[in-house]
């Protein structure tokens, strides 16, 4: 699995929506998401429309319009998001559980490469299925509290 720019932007946009999530119908304006995460607005609109069609976000039209998570952040996993934006989590399609395609090896059941790729897939899936947007928000808050190290400074 390689996270594309589109996938990264989707996660960053959803992080904003998760941090601002409330049980009421309040929304976050797309311009605000764009500015807070430095994402081009046109590209962000496409990503959010895609996430809307997946049922991850919902929108409200009009002057007071914007986007919000459709479910609480505790109920949206990184796997939900990445599978929709990027496709399979598996590094090769012959080990994908949701997007399986036969590979060209003579015997899949005895392929050493496939065996390692399956272990890789299992590790990725275990993490992505466990981490929710709520946990991502918690991590972001903790990281924001940490002092910058000398290697974080750029001259």
Identify the residue ranges that each predicted region occupies.
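Short alpha-helical segments that sit at the start of domains
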Residues: 1-14
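A short alpha-helical element within helix-turn-helix/winged-helix DNA-binding domains
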Residues: 28-38
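Beta-hairpin "wing" of winged helix-turn-helix
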Residues: 55-70
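Short amphipathic alpha-helical elements of helix-turn-helix/winged-helix folds
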Residues: 13-20, 84
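Key DNA-contact positions within bacterial/archaeal DNA-binding proteins
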Residues: 42
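Basic amphipathic alpha-helical segments that dock to polyanions
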Residues: 17, 47-52
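C-terminal regulatory/oligomerization modules of transcriptional regulators
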Residues: 96-155
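Conserved segment of winged-helix/HTH DNA-binding domains
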Residues: 73-98, 113-122
């Amino acid at each position: 699995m390689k996270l594309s720019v589109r996938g990264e932007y989707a996660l960053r946009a959803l992080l904003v929506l998760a941090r601002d999530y409330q049980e009421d119908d309040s929304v976050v304006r797309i311009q605000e998401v764009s500015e807070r995460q430095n994402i081009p607005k046109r590209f962000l609109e496409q990503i959010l429309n895609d996430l809307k069609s997946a049922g991850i976000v919902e929108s409200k039209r009009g002057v007071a319009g914007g986007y919000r998570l459709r479910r609480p952040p505790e109920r949206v996993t990184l796997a939900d998001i990445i599978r929709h934006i990027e496709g399979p989590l598996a590094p090769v399609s012959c080990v994908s559980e949701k997007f399986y395609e036969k590979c060209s090896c003579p015997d899949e059941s005895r392929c050493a490469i496939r065996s390692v790729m399956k272990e890789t897939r299992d590790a990725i899936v275990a993490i992505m299925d466990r981490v929710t947007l709520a946990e991502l928000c918690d991590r972001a808050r903790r990281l924001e509290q940490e002092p910058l190290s000398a290697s974080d400074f750029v001259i």
